[in-house]
UniProtKB/Swiss-Prot annotation:
Belongs to the KptA/TPT1 family. It holds the Pfam family PTS_2-RNA. Its EC number is 2.7.1.-. This is Probable RNA 2'-phosphotransferase. One of its GO terms (biological process) is tRNA splicing, via endonucleolytic cleavage and ligation. Removes the 2'-phosphate from RNA via an intermediate in which the phosphate is ADP-ribosylated by NAD followed by a presumed transesterification to release the RNA and generate ADP-ribose 1''-2''-cyclic phosphate (APPR>P). May function as an ADP-ribosylase. One of its GO terms (molecular function) is NAD+ poly-ADP-ribosyltransferase activity. The keyword DNA repair does not apply. Keywords: NAD, Transferase.
Amino acid sequence: MSDSRLVKISKYLSKYLRHTPDAIGIKLAPGGWVAVDELITACAKNKFPITRQELEAVVESSEKQRFSFDSTGTLIRANQGHSVEVDLQLEPVVPPDELYHGTGHKSVDSIMETGLCKMSRHHVHLSKDIATAQTVGARHGKPVVFAISAAAMHQAGYIFYCSDNGVWLVDRVPPEYLQKI
């Protein structure tokens, strides 16, 4: 698919996911989300057909990360720049080269096998320094700290957030980006 097609789709999505969703018959849910299937149907009805693959390409190729999918891949939103009322709460940010995760020693084998998963939370929580990760890990017994290759994950398309209190958030950390320290 051509770069010009991706730019055209990106501009179209910007207009309707940021400014005038009602003009194509979509309603943004809290956080600015809309169902991918609903968006694809609305675009087709408005004579601008888009495929799921094109949406994925726009999301993945956008250097400014204008759009993101939720963790299930069933919802999409514009990350910023809205003129309609949307409380996004978090905006994607570029992480430092390394982040850290503290846990108890009982979880190490599982983490090494499957990576870090969000479990019942919305995101995996990461620390910017080893000391904080050790403190977090100590809540679960003898602490173990993992270094996360955050820059490499980001380059691979993983989206990071930083909360107001400095906790770094990501949907998951695959084992290939982890190193026990």
